[in-house]
């Protein structure tokens, strides 16, 4: 057993790729609801003096042949959750607006990240979100139904992307 640990330690020191894989696996978590896969729900730590926050999914995927939509989310850490998108308007200004759902076409993948595209706005936080904290969130999909996920508060997310994949 001791030689196995020595081998693994040596492999980690020699291979940045192995180290990156192990680090990414440490952050990985998610849920599945029918054909919907929710990969790594996360939120960013609160900025000082703010009462709102944001949550994201490193990956939201519809593996099925039927379209679905995320239509609602709730969490005990905020008064309400709004589904939002960000886009540049005709004047070249980035604007955030509430939307009535996040569409998932068959076999679609959506990646969310701070400052780009879609996110879940946590309105009226009951206390600031601190790095490393976890909180529950219930997601409701138009077809697939409801699922409870755990959101992890992190400053940086390995492998996070933005927009539809």
What positions do the PLM features span?
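Absolute protein N-terminus
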Residues: 1, 28-29
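N-terminal secretory signal peptides that target proteins for export/translocation
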Residues: 1-11
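Bacterial N-terminal signal peptides
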Residues: 11-26
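Compact, glycine-rich, soluble single-domain proteins
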Residues: 30-165
């Amino acid at each position: 057993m001791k030689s196995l640990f020595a081998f693994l330690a040596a492999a980690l020191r020699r291979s940045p790729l192995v180290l990156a894989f192990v680090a990414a696996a440490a952050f990985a978590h998610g849920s599945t609801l029918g054909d919907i896969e929710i990969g790594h729900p996360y939120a960013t730590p609160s900025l000082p003096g703010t009462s709102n926050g944001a949550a994201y999914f490193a990956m939201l995927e519809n593996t099925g042949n039927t379209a679905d939509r995320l239509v609602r989310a709730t969490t005990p850490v905020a008064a309400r959750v709004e589904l939002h998108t960000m886009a540049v308007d005709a004047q070249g200004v980035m604007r955030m607006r509430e939307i009535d759902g996040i569409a998932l076409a068959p076999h679609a993948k959506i990646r969310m990240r701070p400052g780009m595209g879609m996110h879940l706005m946590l309105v009226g936080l009951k206390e600031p979100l601190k790095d490393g904290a976890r909180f529950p969130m219930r997601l409701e999909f138009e077809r697939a139904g409801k699922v409870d996920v755990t959101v992890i508060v992190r400053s940086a997310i390995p492998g996070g992307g933005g927009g539809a994949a």
